[in-house]
């Protein structure tokens, strides 16, 4: 098992996620503006849940929902949410964006996403990593 990624107020485990926490995700979480006091937030392709957790730490949003399509990443994201100080405001759905929109149909005050950036072939030997990159 890998060492968890520790922040001041929470810890993120990432040993089961294909895409690990990187500088871009941490910066996006820090730079995402919450000055308009969002009530509801959606994190698309949440991975470890890092963006949702950082927004929960920095805001008073009452509903922070994340969606993750990969089985292992979904389980790890859910565990990271459960183990956080904001577990009453965080929820992860195991679904694609299309499935989520068709089933839930809510609107959100803030939507965040940290898509992978690949200009050419994204395929690797790891199917979970390929899914996270696509």
Q: Language-model segments: which ranges?
A:
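Class I SAM-dependent transferase core
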Residues: 1-36
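Short alpha-helix immediately C-terminal to the canonical SAM-binding loop
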Residues: 74-75
């Amino acid at each position: 098992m890998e060492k968890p990624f520790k922040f001041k107020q929470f810890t993120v485990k990432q040993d089961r996620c294909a895409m690990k926490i990187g500088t871009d995700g941490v910066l996006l979480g820090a730079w995402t503006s919450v000055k308009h006091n969002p009530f509801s937030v959606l994190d698309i392709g949440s991975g470890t849940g890092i963006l949702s957790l950082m927004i929960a730490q920095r805001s008073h949003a009452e509903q922070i929902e994340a969606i993750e399509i990969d089985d292992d990443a979904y389980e790890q994201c859910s565990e990271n949410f459960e183990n956080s100080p904001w577990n009453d405001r965080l929820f992860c759905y195991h679904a694609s964006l299309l499935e989520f929109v068709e089933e839930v149909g809510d609107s959100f005050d803030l939507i965040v996403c940290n898509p992978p950036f690949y200009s050419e072939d994204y395929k690797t030997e790891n199917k979970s990593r390929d899914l996270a990159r696509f």
